Amino acid sequence: MELNLKGKTALITGGSRGIGFGAARVLASEGVNIHITSRTAADLDAAKKKITDAYKVTVTCHPCDLAAEGAAEKLAAEVGDIDFLVNNAGAIPQGTVVSLDEKTWRKSWDLKVWGFINLTREYYARMAKKKSGVIVNVIGAAGERHSSGYIAGSMGNASLMALSRALGADSHKDGIRVIGINPGGTETDRQVVRWRALAEKQFGNAERWRELVTGFPFGRLGTVDEVANMVAFLCSDASGYTTGCVITIDGGASHIK
């Protein structure tokens, strides 16, 4: 399928690794010029090299901490107008309502929840002026499959699902589409490190980590590309009637009791 994205511009937060990097790479393969953010400049430089070695697009790196006050406004001023915003940065730690202290809770929400909100506010206004744009929020399936052991993540993700649905329900009036994506278990570097540690503990052999995920749908984790391809599709006019919804990519795990 031809997505007709060549020459467009996208900003992907958390774009140096994992799903964010995957989204940047897939969009670049479609001819989209890329802006990526991360808190680590070296990671951004490595991601840029991988993309520009493979595709003839412009990749601009923006080292920044989107949890900082005023960071979204500053980033938007640096990047300028774009066609697609992919909010992806941020990871919320495990923990119960008792074990997670307020400082940790607030810090994680400052990056993921407020990071998404603040950049959406900045770019929604810009996109509305030109009556065109797509905002994709890469959230997480815990927002719909809640866990008391992941209380901050469940609540934070649920709030971003509400943002995507509420804003996207009326955004057509401004020529904008807003969509959420909820990845389930996905084979990112970060997740593989976690599974390898569990395999080392259980089997004494980190290389056996795949044995621990056979209980997932299809006997495996999802791949980064399976999420990244959806990001690219949602950005395209091929998905031009899609807004105000959240698409779950978890192999059906959310429906398993």
What are these regions (language model features)?
Residues T9, S16-G18:
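Conserved glycine-rich cofactor-binding loop
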Residues A91, V98-N118, S132, V136, ...:
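Catalytic Tyr-X3-Lys loop
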Residues A125, A169-D170, G240:
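Alpha-helical segment proximal to the catalytic Tyr-Lys
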Residues V136-S159, S164-K173, G185-T186:
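Catalytic loop of short-chain dehydrogenase/reductase
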